[in-house]
Amino acid sequence: MLPEFEYAKGLFNEYGLELSEEQYEKLDIYAEFLVEYNEKVNLTAITEPDEILKKHFIDSVLMLKFVDIPRDSSMIDVGTGAGFPSVPIAVFRPDIKLTLLDSLNKRTIFLEKLCEKLGVKAEIIHGRAEEVSKNEKYREQFDVVQERSRIWLF
């Protein structure tokens, strides 16, 4: 589905990022499953292989170049949607203890299937951030909070 490995590797290199064949294969599975699942559940408007590579995968992983996340850190992605940016980050940093939070059950079902396909270990929570953040199990328990357009709750 994705453009060929050498092309993808070259794009990652342009941003100072390394891409292994194993990582590429996982991203390719991700892209294919995303587009397939998107036909029944609206997850993203971006479905062209080159755009998925650039706007979903490189944009997600680029954070690792600018933010030093210590080994074995815990990270929650609030309002994760289709898993961006945290699932691609987990492909590159499998040591991160990942929690994915989304308010829509159809997206959490997608994420469960996706993580299983990729071998990504993640706790997936179906819930609203405003409610989950009140739960002692999750409140102030993460080293990194990843979110888009959300108020600070954790």
Predicted regions and their residues:
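Conserved SAM-binding loop of SAM-dependent methyltransferases across substrates and taxa
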Residues: 82-95
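Conserved class I S-adenosyl-L-methionine
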Residues: 71-81
